[in-house]
Structures are given as C-alpha cells and as structure tokens.
C-alpha cells in the first residue's frame, strides 16, 4: 500500500537527505567569484578603455572572457594602470587583482619581493624596444646617447632591454642623464624636445609618422635576446581557490591568440588594435617582417622560459633585485596544455629553443 501521508519523522528525514544532496551545489555556486579582476600594465585609451599589441588585448576587445562567463553571472573587470608593471605589482600585493597582463621584468621584481603568482601563458613575445630622438637631433646611434637626457620608464620591461642594448655599446645608465618617465609623459617630452631621446615601444611610431621624432634603434634587429616578453599571470590564492575559473580564462585567451596569429586576420587585427588609439600604421611598423605566430604565440616553450631566466639573472647583475629569483616552477602550463588540446591547437604555433631557433 502506498503511504500517501508520510509520518513527520519520515518527512523530516527526506528533507534532511534532500538538503545534504543540494548542499554541494549551493556551496559550489557560492564559491564562484562575483567578478574576475584582470590588471593591464599600461594605460587604456577610449571609453571603455582598451589596449592593443597582444593576444590579451584581442581577448579584451572581442570580449572573449566576458562571453565565456556570460551565463554564470560572473562579471569581468579590466583594470588599467598608467604606472604599468610597477603599479600592477602594487595592486597584486594588495590582493586587488586576480589575473594580470604585464611584462617580464616587473613580474621578476614582484617575485623577488615574495609576491606569489603563476605564469599561465605568453601574451606577446619578441617585442622590440625603440629609441627615438627629435627629428633634427645629431644623435645617430646608441653610442651618441652618452651624457644625453634620456627617458626610460624604470621597472618596466623596456628598461632591461635598453640596459642590455647600452651594454652592447659600452654604456650603462650611469653614462646617461636618465629621466624616469611613464609612456605618456615621455612622448610629450620628446615631442616638445624636453629630452634628447626616449626609450619606448610602438607608440614612438606615431611621433615618427607625425614628423616629431626619428627612430635610431630597434632592438629586435639585434636578435631575440634583445626582445621583451609579456604574459598572463594568476595570483596563487585565486588559482588554488578557482582552478576551473583559471582554465576558462586561459581557454578564452588561447582563442584570442589563435585568431590574432592567423595571417588572414592581419589587417583586421591591426584595425581592431587601432581602437586603442595607436594607429594602424604603427602596428604595421611594429610587426613588419615578423610572422604573427612568432609574436603572438601563447606557448611556454624553452625560448620563453630562457628569456625569463635571463631577465632574472640580468636584474640581479644590474642590482635591480637583491637576491636570485627562481624561475623553475613559476610557470604553470597545465591550463594552457588543456586549452591547446581542447581547441586542437597542439601544433599550431612553432616552438623555439632557448636561443630562439625553431625546434624540429
């Protein structure tokens, strides 16, 4: 006979079992972050702010991370820092970010100070440093910079490449009158001839094309050892608490990297990045004679690891840090490997050895 009216004890037991079954789902939902905070180590342009030059920029402009979490009710917040890498490090130290896009040297500086993060993937690699001077300047080469007023944004990944380029020419920062300026201030100072030279990035092409500067040096022409790398990192605490979220963020950025690396999209890519305020022509110049797959590869290959080890060693040699930084174990490739497999991209990007030569 069917018991149509269960006893109070049986009803209580049924409710208790139901609540225990439901509890893990409720707990898991409550454990999701309300917002994913991604720091960007540069000043954004526009409203809302955007940036360019990397697969992370593509992901932000195409809202790939936002689309990934649209059905979860999780917001994605991109936070831009005029103070670049050093300012991002401060935000990381204050637990104000979950992820960050920044350059190699700032991350090494943070690690030397005990900030615990994991490097998830490369966002842009083999990026050159440019040195520009006023158009009527008599400066023709790095050797001519001795005793000149030169702006360098210290603590960013521009600094170390510039220091190595100076060393190759028998100079150091002490041989120059170095002025520490952020990117915007440096561009303004160069345009007004308030300085004799500026160490910068692709933004210097805009001044050149406007007739306000000439570029006397591009570090990528000296080989991959004179380039800078950027990455996406995650804070240790966030990764331990939300590995599933980390995986999905990496999935989204790998999608952006694949689209950005497709030569069929070169024109569309530079037009997309031009929304950041950097002209299309500047991106053309910055990526001239380089394959998109080489510049926008997310791979954690021997070349990338070697460059971070070199940055750590050079930073110690130049006394930018006080103690050695261990790079081994800093990278966490499992999320990238999962994304590459899921998107059938295991062999899409070429891998390079520590010296920058293709692996067979």
Regions found by a protein language model. Give the residues of each.
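Short, well-ordered beta-strand elements
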Residues: 32-56, 74-80, 147-151, 177-179
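Conserved C-terminal helix/tail region of periplasmic/extracytoplasmic solute-binding proteins
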Residues: 313-360
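Short, polar/charged alpha-helical segment
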Residues: 45-76, 112-113, 307
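A ligand-binding cleft/hinge motif common to bilobed small-molecule-binding domains
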Residues: 101-113, 163-164, 168, 195-215, ...
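Pocket-lining segment of extracytoplasmic ligand-binding domains
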Residues: 179, 185-277
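Secondary-structure end/capping motifs
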Residues: 44-46, 50, 241-324
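Flexible hinge/capping segments at coil-to-helix
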Residues: 134-149, 240-244
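Short helix-initiation/N-cap motifs at beta->coil->alpha
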Residues: 78-90, 103, 171, 176-191
């Amino acid at each position: 006979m069917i018991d149509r009216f269960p006893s109070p004890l049986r009803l209580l037991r049924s409710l208790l079992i139901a609540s225990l079954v439901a509890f893990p789902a409720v707990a898991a939902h409550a454990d999701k972050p309300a917002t994913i905070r991604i720091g960007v180590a540069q000043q954004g342009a526009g409203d809302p702010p955007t940036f360019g030059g990397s697969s992370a920029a593509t992901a932000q402009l195409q809202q790939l991370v936002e689309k990934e979490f649209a059905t979860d009710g999780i917001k994605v917040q991109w936070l831009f820092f005029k103070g670049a890498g050093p300012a991002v490090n401060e935000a990381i130290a204050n637990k104000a970010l979950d992820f960050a896009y920044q350059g190699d040297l700032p991350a090494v500086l943070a690690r030397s100070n005990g900030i615990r993060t994991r490097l998830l993937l490369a966002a842009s690699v083999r990026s050159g440093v440019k040195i520009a001077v006023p158009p009527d300047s008599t400066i023709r080469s790095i050797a001519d910079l001795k005793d000149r007023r030169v702006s360098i944004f210290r603590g960013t990944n521009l600094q170390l490449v510039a220091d190595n380029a100076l060393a190759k020419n028998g100079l150091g920062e002490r041989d120059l009158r170095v002025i520490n300026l952020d990117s915007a201030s440096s561009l303004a100072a160069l345009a007004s001839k308030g300085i004799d030279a500026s160490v910068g990035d692709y933004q210097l092409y805009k001044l050149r094309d406007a007739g306000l500067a000439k570029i006397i040096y591009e570090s990528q022409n000296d080989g991959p050892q004179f380039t800078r790398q950027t990455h996406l990192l995650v804070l240790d605490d966030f990764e331990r608490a939300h590995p599933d979220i980390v995986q999905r963020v990496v999935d989204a950025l790998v999608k952006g990297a694949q689209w950005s690396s497709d030569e069929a999209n070169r024109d569309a890519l530079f037009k997309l990045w031009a929304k950041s305020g950097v002209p299309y022509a500047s991106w053309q110049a910055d990526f001239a004679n380089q394959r998109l797959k080489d510049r926008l590869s997310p791979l954690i290959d021997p070349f990338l690891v070697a460059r971070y080890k070199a940055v750590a060693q050079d930073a110690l040699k130049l006394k930018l840090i006080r103690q050695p930084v261990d790079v081994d174990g800093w990278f966490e490739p499992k999320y990238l490997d999962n994304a590459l497999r899921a998107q059938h991209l295991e062999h899409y990007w070429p891998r390079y050895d520590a010296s920058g030569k293709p692996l067979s």
